[in-house]
């Protein structure tokens, strides 16, 4: 049975509080828009596809709870809800993609009345979830062929089932190759400062029985130098039209290291993460988070009181460092500007 990160239950958006993993499996019930927005901002739920699914359910929740008497009044509420949700994590394009799709669906059925909008949005949120899950499995099928025979893969952050509707993006090729009986061993970057690798990816791989070794972020170069890494597979929060990739802070450094050591560097992401309206990585907004997440771990200070800390949550990897992008429609290779447009036109 696959892990489900977010779901609709008894008129509420339910999700696993990923801040509590791996020690506690706690389900959070979001009963209003404010709770959904907080879940996204506080990283109770995280990972671009999972955020998109959560936001879609959040829009459906707003519609269900609305007392609007006319479609136009309900649409106004939904526009406001979209603005609230979109502002929570600005780097992840799946968030605005999902809320935009929900709003378009509401507008499409507005002539049928308020109840039609409510029913349509609930169905659309479920469709977004189901599509994301299917895309993850397709990414796994396409990407498994890229894993070298020895199967030593380095990952960064968490782009597994917890970050998506299920199965994952970066972990999907690994899981598929493992299911095919091929040798796989995953080197898991701990991923400071939020430790998504150590807390979440390591936990997911343990649940799946996939061999792994947890490493600190500053061990990656050493592991590459010693010949321990055959390829790198990461996820993405936004892919610009030219193939530049925004992902968890530290991804860019791994891409530079991989290029120096002649190691393939792959990005796995659904097509909903591709943003053709963003020309390059220079145009991607980079979220700045609370410096306390750097100076503290699990509420415990690890730095002197009063020290200043930087905390950009993402960085941008230039397209020339990306060997290929694995999508649900196939593997995209350079030149990305033309290849990504061709991929999108094939929808």
UniProtKB/Swiss-Prot annotation:
Site-annotated residues for Transition state stabilizer: 157
Pathway in which this enzyme or protein is active: Amino-acid biosynthesis; L-methionine biosynthesis via salvage pathway; L-methionine from S-methyl-5-thio-alpha-D-ribose 1-phosphate: step 1/6
Short name of any one Pfam family annotated for the protein: IF-2B
Biological processes per GO annotation: L-methionine salvage from methylthioadenosine
Record has RNA-binding as a keyword: no
A GO molecular function held by the record: S-methyl-5-thioribose-1-phosphate isomerase activity
Reaction it catalyzes: 5-(methylsulfanyl)-alpha-D-ribose 1-phosphate = 5-(methylsulfanyl)-D-ribulose 1-phosphate
Class of enzymatic activity (EC top level): isomerase
Alphabetic keyword roster: Amino-acid biosynthesis, Isomerase, Methionine biosynthesis
Residue sites binding substrate per the record: 46-48, 89, 196, 247-248
Catalytic residues in the record: 237 (proton donor)
Enzyme Commission designation: 5.3.1.23
Keyword set includes Phosphoprotein: no
Family, similarity comment: Belongs to the eIF-2B alpha/beta/delta subunits family. MtnA subfamily.
Entry function: Catalyzes the interconversion of methylthioribose-1-phosphate (MTR-1-P) into methylthioribulose-1-phosphate (MTRu-1-P).
PANTHER family: METHYLTHIORIBOSE-1-PHOSPHATE ISOMERASE (PTHR43475:SF1)
Protein name (database record): Methylthioribose-1-phosphate isomerase
Species: Chloroflexus aurantiacus (strain ATCC 29366 / DSM 635 / J-10-fl)
């Amino acid at each position: 049975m696959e892990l489900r990160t977010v779901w609709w239950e008894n008129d509420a958006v339910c999700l696993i509080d990923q801040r509590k993993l791996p020690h506690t499996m706690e389900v959070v019930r979001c009963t209003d828009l404010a709770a959904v927005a907080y879940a996204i901002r506080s990283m109770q739920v995280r990972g671009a596809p999972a955020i998109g699914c959560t936001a879609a359910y959040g829009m459906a929740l707003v519609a269900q709870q609305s007392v609007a008497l006319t479609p136009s009044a309900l649409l106004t509420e939904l526009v406001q809800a979209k603005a609230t949700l979109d502002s929570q994590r600005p780097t992840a394009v799946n968030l605005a993609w999902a809320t935009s799709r929900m709003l378009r669906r509401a507008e499409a059925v507005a002539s049928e009345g308020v109840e039609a909008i409510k029913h349509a949005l609930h169905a659309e949120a479920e469709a977004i979830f189901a599509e994301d899950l299917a895309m993850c499995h397709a990414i796994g099928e396409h990407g498994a062929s890229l894993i070298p025979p020895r199967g030593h893969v380095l990952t960064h952050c968490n782009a597994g089932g917890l970050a998506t509707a299920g199965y994952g993006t970066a972990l999907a090729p690994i899981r598929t190759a493992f299911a095919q009986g091929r040798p796989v061993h995953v080197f898991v970057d701990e991923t400071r400062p939020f430790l998504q690798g150590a807390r979440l990816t390591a936990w997911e791989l343990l649940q799946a029985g996939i061999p792994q070794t947890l490493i600190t972020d500053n061990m990656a170069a050493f592991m590459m130098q010693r010949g321990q890494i055959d390829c790198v597979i990461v996820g993405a929060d936004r892919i610009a039209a030219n193939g530049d990739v925004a992902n968890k802070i530290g991804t860019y450094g791994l891409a530079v290291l991989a290029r120096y050591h002649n190691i393939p560097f792959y990005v796995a992401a659904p097509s909903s993460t591709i943003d053709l309206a963003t020309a390059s990585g220079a145009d991607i907004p980079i979220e700045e988070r609370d410096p306390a997440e750097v100076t503290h771990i699990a509420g415990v200070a690890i730095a002197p009181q009063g020290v200043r800390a930087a905390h950009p949550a993402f960085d941008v990897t230039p397209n020339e460092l990306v060997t290929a992008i694995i999508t649900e429609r196939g593997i995209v290779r350079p030149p990305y500007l033309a290849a990504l447009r061709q991929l999108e036109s094939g929808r």
